[in-house]
């Protein structure tokens, strides 16, 4: 999950950086797009919105900006359909959007790897959408998650983001270009509030359950929300032993969800206050209605 990097008192552990790759991409003839993690809202105060990031990224030289919360809507809808099938078949499943959790399953519970949802992560969903329109596009994910780097390097999922930057890495590039985040209104919104809340522990479950309601699936599965690595391990052990009473596990390797990621810019409690203020201003669009605005048929969610 990357927590060790910031916990090590000697600074002995580091992660691969894609800063040079991103800079070279910006200098190339290819179009380069930024995909911002849902956890971004609230990290830099109540006045720094997704609109603030969109403007800053344009000033740096990126060709486009999309909030990964839109990918959250896409993942929620796809995973809802997948879970309905699994529920009817009596199969237990675990979520696939947290790479730290996926790494844990594959490393420590390899016999349960087939329980991982086949639905791609929100980051990958947005990247595939962009590349369906422009196959030569370069996609860059920015967020508080170090494990996302392992998702793009190790998991080798077709159409996934090309590079991943932490907030500090992106801000270093911004600093070199003399660009700062400026206060902006909340008029820029591409995802439902459910997609935005993917970054919170329990947010994936809420979005998937909402999608089930919107598609009138007629089922109410029991979902175990594993908050942090310790809980993830505990519930995976129960599932392995056949003693998990729930139908699905939502696994978040970081406590609090992505907002508690190892490369977060701010304290999680401080971020929560700002984040709540921002999300209250989001409109109440539904997940499935929102996805009608995008060409979902042009790429696969699995």
Task: List each model region and its residues.
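Iron-sulfur-associated redox domains of electron-transfer enzymes in respiratory
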Residues: 15-302
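Cysteine-centered iron-sulfur cluster-binding motifs in ferredoxin-type domains/subunits
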Residues: 1-11, 253, 257-258
């Amino acid at each position: 999950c990357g927590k060790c990097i910031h916990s090590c008192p000697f600074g002995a552990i580091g992660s691969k950086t894609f800063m040079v790759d991103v800079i070279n991409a910006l200098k190339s003839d290819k179009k380069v797009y930024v995909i911002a993690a849902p956890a971004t809202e609230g990290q830099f105060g109540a006045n720094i919105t997704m609109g603030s990031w969109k403007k800053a990224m344009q000033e740096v030289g990126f060709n486009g900006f999309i909030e990964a919360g839109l990918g959250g809507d896409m993942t929620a809808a796809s995973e809802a359909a997948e879970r309905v099938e699994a529920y009817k078949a009596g199969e237990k499943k675990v979520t696939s959007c947290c790479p730290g959790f996926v790494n844990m399953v594959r490393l420590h519970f390899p016999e349960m790897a087939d329980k991982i949802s086949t639905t791609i992560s929100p980051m990958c969903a947005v990247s595939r959408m962009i590349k369906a329109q422009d196959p030569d596009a370069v996609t860059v994910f920015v967020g508080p998650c170090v494990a996302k780097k392992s998702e793009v390097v190790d998991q080798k999922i077709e159409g996934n983001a090309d590079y991943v930057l932490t907030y500090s890495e992106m801000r270093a590039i911004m600093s070199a270009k003399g660009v700062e985040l400026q206060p902006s209104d909340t008029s820029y919104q591409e995802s439902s509030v459910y997609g935005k809340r993917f970054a919170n522990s329990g947010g994936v479950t809420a979005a998937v359950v909402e999608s089930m309601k919107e598609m009138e699936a007629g089922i109410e599965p029991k979902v175990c929300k594993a908050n942090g690595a310790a809980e993830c391990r505990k519930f995976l052990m129960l599932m392995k032993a056949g003693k998990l009473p729930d139908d699905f596990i939502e696994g978040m390797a970081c406590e609090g969800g992505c907002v508690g990621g190892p490369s977060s810019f701010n304290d999680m409690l401080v971020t929560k206050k700002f984040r709540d203020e921002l999300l209250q201003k989001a409109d109440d669009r539904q997940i499935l209605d929102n996805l009608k605005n995008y060409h979902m048929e042009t790429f696969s969610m699995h």
